[in-house]
Amino acid sequence: MNLKLASSPHELRTCLAGRAFVLVPTMGALHEGHIWLVDMARRCNLPVVVSIFVNPLQFDDSLDLDTYPRTLEQDLEKLEGKAFAVYSPSVETMYPNGLDSIRIDPGPIGRILEGAIRPGFFDGILTIVAKLLLQTAPERVFFSKKDAQQAFLVRRMVRELAFPVRVEVTGFLRDKFSLPYSSRNRKLGVDAREKAQRLSQGLLSVVNNGPLTVRDCIDKITDLANSIGVDLGYAQILDENFCEIASDRMVTRAFHSEACIGLNTPLFLLAARVHGVRVVDNVDLVVV
């Protein structure tokens, strides 16, 4: 199978020739976690299209945008034999009237956690996902639970705006030291990577020594972040609807499953800066 490359909706339609397909949106700099998501999408027995577009609206820091890795040639090599086509449009194709265009408001849930730290972040996410869905018209679209808040908001947008597409939310991969795969991990030095790994390991083992209250779990991770010198952006436990859980309820289990499908359990979500590099993580919880 020869991987096809399209840079416009017309080129993509020509490649697909009327076939139904599934879409995996990415910003490129593909890693093992992306490839695993593509493999999950292939289980649908439909052609897989991977979009690669570094979306300017998602960045509140111009330096972060400028330094975000762009590795199209390497990405194409990784997708050969796995995807049917890559859709890699230009900024002008996605935003023909410039970046000061109509945006989709994510609502209150888009202004907590990542949305509180990065104002406008989810406006950018939802706007580009909506544009991709309208331009490409997939049968299904795949997202990783690693970015759980993003997946939740996309799923809600699709439902409320009646997009004719099914949103699939899958589990995600971790490396052998428990750190979730991320394109930004390549920016981590040896010391920073070790700290990020310790944070993820702490999240996974938060109730290994017995049940704790929601408040105690958050305090435990906060103390860990402080002890290893990590700048914690947030550490919060929310239910499957991204609502707060009473602080005196008990957490009896924290777990990670690559095979987990959907967003149907409470989550312990955190974000931190480790030597200036953003890391995000979450684990599923059993809360009683």
UniProtKB/Swiss-Prot annotation:
Keywords: ATP-binding, Cytoplasm, Ligase, Nucleotide-binding, Pantothenate biosynthesis. Belongs to the pantothenate synthetase family. ATP binds at M27, G28, A29, L30, H31, E32, G33, H34, L173, Y181, S182, S183, R184. It catalyses: (R)-pantoate + beta-alanine + ATP = (R)-pantothenate + AMP + diphosphate + H(+). This is Pantothenate synthetase. The lineage of its organism: Bacteria, Bacillati, Actinomycetota, Actinomycetes, Micrococcales. It comes from the Bacteria. (R)-pantoate binds at Q58, Q150. Catalyzes the condensation of pantoate with beta-alanine in an ATP-dependent reaction via a pantoyl-adenylate intermediate. It is found in: Cytoplasm. It is an enzyme of class 6 (ligase). One of its GO terms (molecular function) is pantoate-beta-alanine ligase activity. GO terms for cellular component: cytosol. Homodimer. PANTHER family: CYTIDYLATE KINASE/PANTOATE-BETA-ALANINE LIGASE, PANTOATE--BETA-ALANINE LIGASE. The reaction proceeds by a bi uni uni bi ping pong mechanism. GO terms for biological process: pantothenate biosynthetic process. InterPro entries: Pantoate_ligase, Pantoate_ligase_C, Rossmann-like_a/b/a_fold. The active site is at H34 (proton donor). Beta-alanine binds at Q58. Its EC number is 6.3.2.1. It holds the Pfam family Pantoate_ligase. Pathway: Cofactor biosynthesis; (R)-pantothenate biosynthesis; (R)-pantothenate from (R)-pantoate and beta-alanine: step 1/1.
